[in-house]
Amino acid sequence: MNNKIMKEGLTYDDVLVVPAYSEVLPYMVSTSTKFTKNIILNIPIVSAAMDTVTESIMAIAIAQEGGIGVLHKNMSIERQALEVRKVKRSESGMILDPITLTLSATVGDAFALMRENKIGGIPIVDEDVKLLGIVTNRDLRFEKDMNLSISEVMTSGQLITTELNDLENAESILKENKIEKLPIVNSDNQLVGLITFKDIIKNRMRPNACKDQYGRLRVAAAVGVTDDVLKRVEALSNASVDAIIIDTAHGHTKGVVEVLKKVKSTFPNLDIVVGNIATSAAAQALIDAGA
């Protein structure tokens, strides 16, 4: 029986790493690694796809530091897609799908939408998504009538830009015109994006954040081997998820491989990660299937 009982145990406080001579300075060290073929992490940390660990708050915090969070799948398709959108909208170089209101909205609608999404400004558009104005916290600060039309308080005629190269000079444009939000429109005056001074500050404060090509925080989401997997992946893809994790206890099975092939053939440009596995044979089988 004695050979089955560990007689000595060590914990972190019991072990010290003895420093040795080094010519490597901290600024010379890179902790970056690849999460997928297309996603580089600045720190090798991924949060678990567990309902007690990762929803949008954790995913935002992890991505801000350079890692990536995997949203758990124990929720409805609609809610999981919403969690993805919360991460993607939390900060960005340019918000590609800004939340908007139309002229039929009220001050109460604007207050509710700002509070729900934790935002400070909402572009006002018509039925063709043409920009009519913008309403911000400053416009609503002293408003008491929740039934007042949004057209009565919105700011119209604010500076907008259609020049993509203006993005590089967004901070100077905002400062020069003493505004905090810069709507971006196309040649037909349709809203295509929104740049905020707050996001520019966030970019400066967190230079190692894990972001996509549009400056948005990256996020992954878990799916299972279920009948509605394609429907879930479609919703997540439409929400701009960066990677799909096929999350299962044993990933080296026929069912998992078939789901992987089905997802990859339907969404060929989406990065797919599969787990859990424990052997090189399993890894090769999943790579061959598209992971």
Where are these regions (language model features)?
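Conserved, well-structured core domains of diverse proteins
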Residues: M1-T36, I68
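Conserved, mostly hydrophobic/aromatic
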Residues: D14, S47, I62, V219, ...
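Active-site-adjacent beta->alpha loops and helix N-cap segments on the catalytic face
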Residues: Y27, S76-R85, E143-N147, D166, ...
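Active-site cofactor/substrate anionic-group-binding motifs, chiefly glycine-
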Residues: N38-M75
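Glycine-enriched alpha-helix->loop->beta-strand junction motifs that scaffold or abut catalytic
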Residues: A63-I68, N238-I244, T266-L270, I287-A291
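Catalytic beta/alpha-barrel core
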Residues: V70-N74, T100-L101, G121-P123, T161-E163, ...
